[in-house]
């Protein structure tokens, strides 16, 4: 099972009640640690293609949920410095606004121009739904709209295929997994799925407290937990 790291925001902060923010300095050190361990961060599409071809050794999936504006201003320059790629999961109904679903500090989300800029830089843009709702609480019509309309909006924006999805809050039952597959997504990222698979890929949370020792422990724990192939 692929090793996939899950980030959200990379920015300076005073309060972070949901632990979604990593400081720019910490993030830079985390990326430096990956490089020192001869690991290369890549987007999910590249990772899964390499995994299928048996060429995933030394690769780590890097994912960023929600599409915060600081991805373009803070995270992207560091990724480019190290020659790393990543996947950013965008909430299409909130482009250019803020994280209205969150009761924590307000954080700006990427504008359409910023999304195009990161896509042009080689970052994979994928869907995080339209409104960042917990999908198990939706009816069939709303679920289909969250999946299909968000992808259509992103494909028009980046003028290319959008093949990945990430479940908001990591909430997914077999119903949502089946719906994502039926909607034509090639893969989907979860957090800690009961039954890991290509449309419910586990990810390892990374926060501001994660220095080298904690990162190494998380990598080892992943290797022990997930030994099967996608």
Where are these regions (language model features)?
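A short, conserved beta-to-alpha structural element at the edge of catalytic cores
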Residues: 83-105
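C-terminal active-site subregion of NodB/CE4 polysaccharide deacetylases
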Residues: 1-63, 68-73, 137-230
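A structural signal for isolated positions on well-ordered beta-strands in alpha/beta enzyme cores
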Residues: 87-89, 126, 164
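Acidic (Asp/Glu)-rich catalytic clusters
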Residues: 35, 76-83, 108-127, 181
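Histidine-centered catalytic micro-motifs
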Residues: 5-6, 125-132
């Amino acid at each position: 099972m692929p090793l996939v790291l899950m980030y959200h925001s990379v920015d300076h902060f005073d309060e972070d009640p949901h632990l979604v923010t990593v400081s720019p300095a910490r993030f830079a050190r985390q990326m430096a640690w990956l490089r020192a361990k001869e690991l290369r961060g890549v987007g999910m599409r590249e990772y899964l293609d390499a995994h299928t071809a048996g060429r995933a050794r030394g690769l780590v999936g890097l994912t960023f949920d929600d599409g915060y504006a600081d991805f373009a201003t803070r995270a992207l320059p560091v990724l480019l410095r190290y020659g790393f790629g990543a996947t950013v999961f965008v909430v299409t109904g909130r482009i250019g606004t803020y994280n209205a679903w969150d009761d924590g500090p307000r954080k700006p989300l990427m504008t359409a121009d910023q999304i195009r800029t990161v896509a042009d830089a080689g970052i994979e843009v994928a869907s995080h739904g339209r409104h960042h709702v917990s999908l198990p609480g939706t009816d069939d019509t709303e679920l289909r709209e969250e999946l299909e309309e968000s992808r259509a909006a992103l494909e028009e924006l980046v003028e290319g295929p959008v093949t990945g999805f990430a479940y908001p809050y990591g909430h997914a039952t077999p119903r949502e997994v089946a719906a994502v597959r039926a909607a034509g997504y090639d893969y989907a990222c979860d957090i800690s799925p009961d039954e890991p698979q290509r449309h419910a890929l586990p990810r390892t949370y990374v926060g501001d407290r994660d220095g080298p020792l904690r990162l190494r422990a998380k990598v080892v724990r992943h290797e022990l937990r997930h030994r099967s192939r996608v």
